[in-house]
A protein has these predicted regions:
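Conserved class I S-adenosyl-L-methionine
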Residues: 1-36, 40-48
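Class I SAM-dependent methyltransferase SAM/SAH-binding core
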Residues: 48-87
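Short conserved loop adjoining the S-adenosyl-L-methionine
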Residues: 88-92
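A conserved beta-strand element that flanks and buttresses the S-adenosyl-L-methionine
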Residues: 98
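A short, conserved alpha-helix within the catalytic core of class I
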Residues: 106-117
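C-terminal alpha-helical "lid/dimerization" subdomain adjacent to the S-adenosyl-L-methionine
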Residues: 128-170, 177-178
Length: 192
């Protein structure tokens, strides 16, 4: 766990950092995800602190994450989470899959993950990715600190997506809806 950045030391530090970064858009962001999920069964890839669960209304939820601290914390709260690397493990079939605040971690293999998720999503894939990032700051000190805080392992990508880049990804995968949520860009890719 030494190679994990501060954001991933514990779900409490993760949520605190998220609330600081999102500010007044924090709730709006999760409400938009919940609206798009609807009453579908859901699988969250790289589920982190499983915050989206608090915004769901009786959905069947499962999460996958590579961080044992996050997985153990979620399990203690009774949340269905498994310790898995989504790039090497099979992704179970479910109505709705979300990739939330984590696509950058898979760069330059992010499209491979999207294809893999689409194969397992029965109804839709929702991707919500930050496009306003301190890790992309022109101030080298700020960008260094932000990348250090959010690193996942020794091979973490320093890459963060711009709004234009995420729009291109969503267009490539024929997203039916794209919505800006104050910091994130959310795309909904339906299977219908």
């Amino acid at each position: 766990m030494k190679e994990m950045g501060l954001a991933y030391w514990h779900p409490v530090t993760y949520r605190l950092i998220e609330k600081i970064l999102y500010g007044r858009n924090y709730r709006k962001h999760y409400e938009a995800l919940s609206r798009e999920i609807g009453d579908s069964s859901i699988l969250e890839l790289c589920c982190g602190d499983c915050q989206v669960v608090d915004y769901l209304k009786g959905n069947t939820y499962q999460g996958l994450d590579i961080n044992p601290r996050f997985v153990n914390h979620a399990k203690k709260k009774g949340i269905n989470v498994s310790l898995q690397d989504v790039m090497v493990s099979e992704i179970p079939e479910v109505e709705c899959i979300i990739i939330h605040n984590s696509l950058y971690q898979f760069y330059p293999h992010h499209e491979k993950l999207i294809y893999k998720a689409l194969q397992s999503a029965q109804k839709k894939l929702i991707i919500s990715e930050p496009v306003i990032n301190l890790a992309s700051s022109k101030n080298r000190i700020i960008s260094f600190i932000a990348r250090w805080i959010t690193r996942v392992g020794n091979n973490s990508s320093a890459k963060r997506f711009s709004r234009k880049e995420m729009e291109e990804v969503f267009n490539k995968f024929h997203a039916e809806r794209i919505e800006f949520l104050g910091r994130n860009l959310m795309g909904v890719i339906s299977k219908n």
